[in-house]
A protein has these predicted regions:
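Intrinsic disorder/low-complexity segments, especially N-terminal tails and targeting/processing regions
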Residues: 14-16, 77
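Sec-dependent N-terminal signal peptides
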Residues: 4-14
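Alpha/beta-hydrolase superfamily serine-hydrolase fold, recognizing
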Residues: 23-326
């Protein structure tokens, strides 16, 4: 019931937003979910600039080999003829075929790696019983857009042809920037008559680089992904933001796209664009399961994976993915 009320409020805010008056920043220390308040106090403030970008990349793309593995999931790397590397997670169930999902990692298009999210991918592969292929797509600014989009689509084509995946159960998913890329893959595959996509699994999606939303300005606390970090990342992501598939929310025709699971939080900087995109998908006849979680910041489970509310969020979307993969 709380999610329904929150969603109704968000739709009113988006529909009636006026930018004639300055939008006030919110104090997330007071508004964050009670279970996350103490944890937030331990998160340092972060400034993204040319000096700290290297640190961010090291944190999100470093050596994770010492982290715990799951004996129920096989993990290996493959290299495509193009040189693109893909990390593959396969449940050890002995099946001849599996549902499959292309997973696109977060990191603002400028950082990140599959290993940084391996703890989650192991959980999803095991819990949903699906093969997950996660490409090391090229990052900006060294590789300007659409390099990332091209790599993601190449990985989608490759996995559909080379992995033991059921042709009727191929999903696309991701978190944050990766969720935006996943939404783009669903559109791109539809338009190019590529692999049939059965499901969009979009966590905290960033889908609109062009339009301004109230949530962009309300969330500007740099302990979480916020306006200042978002604007800094944009400087290193040179792109025609209105170009094909860069901002999936700008696509006029959303009909014929696969069902979508969309997760955001009331304290997520991308909250309003996620809700707006969900609304437009529904208007186009697409089945959408939308969750707007009260008091939740952007990618909260990445920051507080052991908090009960975050565990519940992960359990919920793992179960949703499992149902979609049947």
């Amino acid at each position: 019931m709380k999610e329904v009320l929150v969603l109704a409020l968000m739709l009113v805010l988006i529909a009636g937003a006026s930018y004639a008056e300055e939008i006030k920043e919110w104090d997330i220390s007071e508004m964050i979910h009670p279970q996350l308040k103490e944890g937030l106090k331990r998160v340092p403030y972060f400034e993204l600039n040319s000096e700290t970008l290297g640190f961010l990349r090291e944190v999100l793309g470093g050596d994770f080999s010492q982290l715990p593995k799951d004996e129920a999931v096989d993990v290996r790397n493959e290299t495509l003829p193009s040189g693109l590397r893909v990390r593959i997670y396969t449940p050890k169930t002995g099946a001849n075929e599996y549902p499959g999902m292309l997973w696109l990692h977060s990191g603002g298009h400028i950082a990140g790696s599959p290993e940084a999210e391996e703890w989650l991918l192991l959980r999803l592969a095991k819990g949903a019983g699906c093969i997950i292929a996660a490409p090391y797509y090229r990052l900006a600014p060294e590789n300007p857009c659409p390099a990332d989009i091209e790599d993601c689509y190449s990985a989608l084509l490759w996995m559909s042809e080379n992995l033991p995946i059921r042709k009727d159960r191929l999903a696309v998913g991701g978190a944050s920037a990766g969720a935006g890329l996943a939404a783009a893959m669903a559109q791109m595959s539809r338009d190019k008559h590529g692999p049939a996509i059965c499901y969009q699994f979009l966590l905290y999606p960033q889908v609109d680089f062009v339009n301004d939303y109230p949530s962009h300005h309300q969330i500007n606390d740099s302990r979480v992904w916020c306006l200042s970090l978002h604007l800094a990342a944009l400087k290193w992501y040179p792109a025609d933001f209105s170009g094909d598939y860069v901002s999936p929310a700008l696509t006029e025709d959303l009909s014929g796209l696969p069902p979508a699971y969309i997760l955001t939080g009331t304290l997520d900087i991308f909250r309003d664009e996620a809700v707006s995109y969900a609304q437009r998908l529904m208007q186009a006849g697409v089945l959408v399961e939308l969750h707007v979680m009260p008091g939740i910041v952007h990618a909260c489970e990445f920051l507080f994976p052991n908090a009960p509310v975050c565990v519940k969020i992960m359990d919920n979307y793992t179960n949703a993915l499992k149902e979609a993969m049947k």
